[in-house]
């Protein structure tokens, strides 16, 4: 799983700073991070595509994808497979 890399992209994209380092696989994202609004989701998707060299279609994404850091990392890993 790409947990640490996804976490770093998330921290950089949302400008979470040192507080972002506390995020764990089971840390809730959507609805829990005020920085992760609808525009930030779009920006984050672009950053993940660029960093990991993947393509993410709108149909691939659901709220459960962004439920936790672990679910987001698992999604990225699956896209890379």
Regions found by a protein language model. Give the residues of each.
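Thiotemplate assembly-line natural product biosynthesis machinery
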Residues: 1-20, 74-81
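Phosphopantetheine carrier-protein modules
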Residues: 15-36, 53-62
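C-terminal structural segments of small proteins and small subunits
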Residues: 54, 58-62, 66-79
